[in-house]
Amino acid sequence: VPVDCAAAAVLQVAAATAAATASAGRLSFALIVPATPAEWAASAFVVSGFAYFAVISVVLSVIDLRTHRLPDRIVLPAYAVAGALLASAALLTQDWSALVRAAVGMVAMYAFYFVLRVIRPGGMGGGDVKLAGVIGIYLGFIGWGALAVGAFAAFVYGGVFGIALMLSRRAKRTTAIPFGPWMILGAWTGVFAGQAVGSWYLILLAGV
């Protein structure tokens, strides 16, 4: 199976995502500089939220690669977990804009993937649509740059992977390729590089 030939490489990427659990602390301090007990508690909620996302990132990547499925029993609870942890952090710091961005990110990502599924049912699975909403919560919480870059990066990674398979004659245009791992890799790209890339792009536009 063409996808299996590249599974080892993709699984290494997914395993590397688990290292984001350790990096979640640094991410939290980048979002919230703790100075009060409430801010320390908020930082702990952010760390927990992104550590949880790191764990399910690996689990979902492995499952999708092997079965072409993103199980509801893992994806759907992530809405509640991510929502509760990140909302708690935002409430403690009174960062209402983060709450708005997370909500907009969830709706926008879900709606975008839902439309893609309607337009081309065979190209996007229902699990991808549900996962998109979860990813939107995390990326939106961080910022608009993270949301834009994370959403776009998934299609870049998936497209490059698909082209590479076709050029190596391991796949055809009709070959089913799991998209979940690329959504997840794109999400983590948005998490750690989205704001910087977004700022760089705005500076570039301003200089044109």
Region annotations inferred by a language model:
Residues 60-63, 67-159, 199-208:
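Functional transmembrane core segments of multi-pass inner-membrane proteins
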Residues 156-168:
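Transmembrane alpha-helical segments of integral membrane proteins
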Residues 12, 22-92:
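Intramembrane alpha-helical segments
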Residues 1-40, 200-208:
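Short, strongly hydrophobic alpha-helical membrane anchors
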Residues 193-196:
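Transmembrane helix exit motif
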